Structures are given as C-alpha cells and as structure tokens.
Amino acid sequence: MAKTKDKSIFVSSVDSDSDIEEIIMPPKPPVEVIQLDDSDDECQDICKPIYNKKVHKDPIVRVSYRQRIPESYFPGISTSLINVQREHNNRSKYDTWGSNSCSEPRISISNIERLEKPSYHEARRVPVFERLERSREISNGRNNQNPIRFNHKFVPPINRQTPLFNNQQLLVNVPFNEHHPTFLEPRPFYRSNVNEYNAGGLNRGSFRKMGRLNMEIVRDNDDFEEHFLAPNFPAKSASIDRRVDDSLSSNSYLRSGMIMASSERLEDPRFSGRLPVFARQINNQEINNDNFYQNSICYNHNNYPSNLESRVSFPFEARHHDADGLNRGRYQVMEHVNMGIMRNSEDFEDYDITQTDQDNHFYNDKDSGKHHRHRHRSKNNKKHKKHYDRNESGNSSECREEDDYEISNPSEKRHERKKRQRSSHRKESACVDEDNYILDEDRFYQQESDEYHNSLEMEREYEHGMDVGVKKEHSYKCDDIARNARKRARLTDDDMARREELFKEWSYSKEIVDGVTQLFGGPPRESERHQKKQKELVFEADRTAMHALSIRSGALVKARLLEIHYATGCHLIFLEEVKRGGYTYVELKGDPEHIKNAQKMIDDMVIDEHYIHDGRESIVYFYNAPHELRNTRGFDLNCRSIEKYCGIIIEKMREVFGIGGYVSTAPLKLTGSVNSIHMARETMQSKTKRFLDEEKFKETVEHCTPISFYRKIIGRCGENLKTIEKVTRTAIVFKRSFDNNEACFSIRGRTDNIKQAIEKIEEITHENQPADDDPGIFQVRVPENMVARLIGRHGVEINRIRSESKAKCYLNAIRGNLDDKFMVCSGGVEEAAYAAYLTKVKIGIIDPKVIQFNSDDFNNLSKVKPMEDPRLVMLKKRYAERKECK
C-alpha cells in the first residue's frame, strides 16, 4: 500500500517486490476529496490487505478516491459520495481472468455515507478467500432471515447467517453526465455488438441506447471481479415482473447466470404502475445455462460469476451463433419495463409469454413446486398467427404454427426456412394487440411525445382566444389528449409539479437536457400574466445579450448557460421557445453587476463541438454588431473577404440608410467549423474595434451642390462616389429629399479627409458646368411627357442624334422645375445647332419643313446667323471634308 503526498489517492500494487509500477491519476475532482487511510473510523472494521501471489499473478495498480457532491444532483436517491475507480494492467479484454487483460475506467455511485466493503476490499486488493473469512468474523452473531446460498465447489463454506455484503452499489456506465440517476426511465439499454467474444466465449458488446435517452442502473462486468460470488438472495421487489417473481425464491438452486435484483430503495415511484408486457416467446429449455446470456456474466479465475445486472430483456432475433450453436441474439424490450432482473432461460422454462396480460395466466403449483402455463390464443385472429424462427440448432426450440401441408423435398424445406428467416429480419416492428401498439421503440415513444406536445399546443391556442362554444369543445378535447398522453408517459401529479424544478437544474451535458425534455414534454410554460411582467426585462436581455443565443431551436446551448450561472451568480430562466422562429428568450435575475458579467459571457460564448446539433459537421453562430454602429454610416465588414479567408458562409441583413451607405446592425449568421468561426469572429471584432476607435476622431459636415450635378457625383452604379470615399477615407450619404433645387449630402471623417472629399466633388461640378455665353452650346427645353420619346428604347433616339450631329448631348434638370428637363447640346456651332434642331423635331416643337431661328425663349438659336436648312449646311460640310481627304 502506498499513498501519494500531493493528493488523497490510494495506490495499491499486487507485486510486493516492486513498488508502484504505474499510477493512473484520476481527473481533478470539482469539489472536495475525502482522504482514506488506515486510521479512518469507517475502515476499522474492514480487514487489512493480504496478498496471495498464487491467486494474483499479474501486478495490478488501482487508484481510487472519493468525492463529495451536492444531493441536488441526485433528487430521489440518497447519494452523497462518488467512488471513482480505475484499474490498468497489461491484460487483453478478450482474455479470461488468469491471462493479461485490462478494463476501462468506471464510475460507481454509493448510496450510503461510507464506502462499501466490497469496493474497499477491491481497492485494497484483498483476495477472495481472506475477504470471506474476514467478513465472517466481523458479522458473526448477526441474525439474518435471508440465508445466503453459494457454490461449495469453488468457495470455502461460510456462515449462512452472514451476509456477503450489506448494501448494494449503483454502477453507472461512463460517461457519467450521460447517465444521470435523476432521469430514470424504465426502458433499458441493450448490447449492440454481439459478434465479438473473448477466449471464454463471453459477449462483451457495447451498450446502445434505444431511440432516446433511457436511464438504467447497470452493474458492469469487471467491477465485482473476485469478490462477488453470485449469492442466491431471495430478491423480492415490487419492480420485478410478477411472472418471474416466483422463480426468485430461496429454494431455487444456484445457477451461474443468477443475477441480483435492484434494491427496494432504488425503486422509482413514477414507474410502479402497469407491469411490462412481452411480445416475444421465450421457451429455451435446452440452452446451456453457463453459455446462454453471456453478456450478463463475467468469469474471474476459477469461473466465479462476478457480474450484477438490473435489467429485464430477452433475445428477440437469432442472428448470431457461436461455435456450439448457441443463440446469442440482440436483446430488446418492447414496452415499458420496470426495473427488474435479467434471468437465464431456465427461469422461464415451461413459460410461454404471449401478447397481453389477459392472454397469460401464470400460477405456481405449491405441491409440485413446478411452474405451469396456461395459454390462450385465438385461432381466428390472424395477428396472432406469427412465425418465430429461433435458430437452426436443436438447442433452442421453434415456436411457430405449422401450415396445413408438409414439404417433403429437402431443398424446398431449406428454401422455405431461408425465406422465413429473411421475413423475420425485415419485420422489426409489428402490432402487439388489438389496440395496435407499435413494437418499434423509437416510433412507439415518439408517438407518445407527439401526442403530449400536440396537447400542449392545443392548450396554448385555447388560451389565446376562441368562441365560447368552440372553447368548451376544444378544452374537453385538450384535457382528454393531455390525460391520455400523461398516462402513457406514466407522469403523476408530483412529476408535473416537479417539472419546473428539474428544468432549472440543467446538467452539463446536452443529452441530459434532451432526455428531460423528452421525459416531461418540453420546458415549463409560463402564464400570460407572468410573461407581461417580465416583458421589459426579457426585451432588454434580448437586445443586449441574446443575439448570440438566437440559434435555431434544438441547437441552443442550454448546458453552457449553467457555467455562466456558476461563474457570475446570475440566475437564468428559460421563458418561452418559439417553434416557428426558433428563438429562445432567457430571463436574467440577479444584481446589476452579475447581469452585466453574464451578458458579457453570453456575447463571448461560441458553440463547442460537443453541442453540434443533429450530428452535423458545421455549426451555426450569430454575431451581433456593437450598438455604437447604429449611429454610424458607411461601415461594412467586407463579408466576402472574411468568407474566403476563414472558409465559412455568412448570411447578412442590411439596413439601408441612403443611396451610398448602409450599416449591418442585424446579427450575422455564420456557418462553418468551430475553428473557422473562431477565426471569423476575431476578424470581425478587430474590424469593428478599429472602426469604432477611428469614429472617436471623426466629424460630420453637410455640403450642398446644384441638383443638376448629383447624378454626376454618384456616377454609374455609384462608381464616382465609391472612388471618392476610398481615396479620401470618408463616408458620403445623400439625403433623399432635395429642397431649394439643391442636393445635400453629409460627409463623415477626419477634418483633412473631409476637405479633400469636397475638393473632389467641386472638380466634378466644375467640369460639367455649362457656359450660357458660349455660342457652341444650345439648350432645348423638353417637357416631362417627351423625355421618354427623346431618349427612346435603350437610348436609341438620343444616340442617333449624337451620331448624326457629332455633338455632345445630355439631359439635365431645370432649376425650379423637377419635372421638365434641358437637352444640352455642346460642341461646334454647326454641330450643336444641328443637334438642337433634331431634338426639336423629335419632340414635335417645330416642323422639319419650316426653319425658325427666332422662335421662342426655349432655345438660343437667335445667336446663330440666319442660314439655310441646317441639313444642307451639314451636307456641304461633309462634302468638303471628303474632298480634302482625297
């Protein structure tokens, strides 16, 4: 025995020649570690470690410690200590006890205040023989009504009045947070991998959950090695099926598959209602009891059965057979099964378990001591005419109804047998009785939960308001559906009252949260009056901190909120879950400082890989921009570059404030891996921080230009405006309403940058300023109803005028009149005059046959000398140019 100085950990080694060969340090306990030593009062009654090299050939190092946890984690079970044991050596898991093997770490929960004797013996590596002798000396003189029966071939005789141990131990499979005793459900686990066996023919398949989270207290294989010798207790409990209760009397002889039932203190009152109904027949009379149900039996050296189970199941398909032709099928329970026992097939001999409780009448013949069966089966009911093919060997019997004819040909027999086997494999779900209970576990329990959720939705709709007559019918229907759903879910009034309390004590594991939701039918629903009182508080929490939690329903990280509660002391309560929108509102209660700290932690919270919803590789995170950006203009995160750099998908919503600028204040939806989301989040935060730091030194200046130039400033698709903003590092936003024939806009940035932007804008206006005194520029007023005619489809007409006249023509607004426009023709005098003439002809002001030089104030053609037809002038000019070229 050796003890470490740093931590209160027992390290024991079997090899006395060498000291500690290997130490496996357990995980750091979250609360308190209780030191165990030889001077402890609790351990005075227990024998000291005595080693026997003949029995223990391989050195084994075990590390054990005890950790105290609050009782609120285990409501309904008086548990205050956890004993974590780990063992490690060089043995293979498929070898027997005599060879080298190893076992995985397991967690055991003790339901008493002190460590139990078997666990203490095993931690100290006390041999079996010395342990039994010592336990006989300690418990000598005690009176026990239930004598212990043991196998005389392998164990030396001890006093039958002495119990082997006083208290049972709850062993929960790792990981611990997935198997919480609070949320016990009567549906057990079953082993899925049944095709792997060790050297002794033992089935060590892994456990698998049936559909959803099902809690079960399971004794694992290697935790009771060398000290639990399968005593034949007369285990009597209300949770045991009454059809096998008589077979558990003290008169039954010891079998290697004898399994202890769970203790009465572990019974759950929620599941003490209707007893289970099996839908398969068990009539295996010729199966060897040492090899059947090997998944529930483990042998240490000298073939001592050392496993303890608390399950009820049975083989329902014979898919796998070992070398001896034994049935090693999967194990499954078809309906709610209370915590009972798993028995060997010999316990069910002479029994024929059929569809319903009414069809089975079991009784015990006290005179003969044998069990009989009485079976009722309706010949006319076609549902009961099912074929059950167990296997091809003679060890297990075939329970099926033969057809009227016999098949004489052996090949036809083989064909029919294979055909029945294929059909039996395909039929994984069937009807049990006339009420059409579905045997498929997932579909069966999903149907119950759907009915319960539908009843809750109907109650909500009823509360929102209907007609008086409709309300009554609706309420009656809701009450019936809810009552039936609660009966099927086996929920009592106490369970419904405890539903709120259970949902406030969230576990660290998301699977536990989902298990509670499935067990009790969703989170607690608050009344409308309570929601009105908390409306302001919830709105503030949603505005400031809950955008990070605005994740689709089902992917909300509820378990991480418990960490925030422990870190800040702020109490978080889930108020409502909206299915359509998928948003969940959380109420924060506590001191103002605690609420601020909780909000910061919620903002910084990123979804972990452990909380990926529906098994997807990508996760969703909502990034909320700071509130200071609401008063800014022209800020953009450049999401496209972030997507390429980080390898994620960003969906954003923009709030448009004007023509040129926008601000992304809505949350951004990021989809990708955890590392890429971390990288994108850091990039966005750095950009926003840099932008906000620069905003402190910026100012806003308003500037106005004539309304005829604002389109030139913006440019085609905003090209001119973007170049000005990029060069000057400013943000320019035009106002939508123009007053006094002026286009006003605001420029935000540093003082030097604002001056530079104004200079760029003045350059554009100066280049496009028309000179009225220039004889080479003509302006023609175009009415509003003629603008489309002058431009033409896709600008065909105005382009024709430009090509014929070789002048620059463009439309411009008229000061004081936003409807009519000017057609400005510039260039040479002849070209501009000809373009103005074509414009007037197009809009119908003049007749092409009549030349008017001094027509009206709509043009300034009076400055041009009287001439002939402008078309003749242009023809003469072109003829002269061609002549010169020749």
From Swiss-Prot:
GO cellular component: cytoplasm; nucleus
Residue intervals of the KH domain: 698-761, 775-839
Biased segments, Basic residues type: 369-388, 415-425
UniProt cross-references to Pfam families, sorted A to Z: KH_1
Record InterPro entries: KH_dom, KH_dom_type_1, KH_dom_type_1_sf
Domain of life: Eukaryota
GO biological process: mRNA processing; regulation of alternative mRNA splicing, via spliceosome
Keywords in alphabetical order: Repeat, RNA-binding
Region (Disordered): 359-433
Annotated PROSITE patterns: KH_TYPE_1
Signal peptide positions (record): none
Biased composition range(s): Basic and acidic residues: 359-368
An example molecular function term from Gene Ontology annotations: mRNA binding
Protein name, UniProt field: KH domain-containing protein hrpk-2
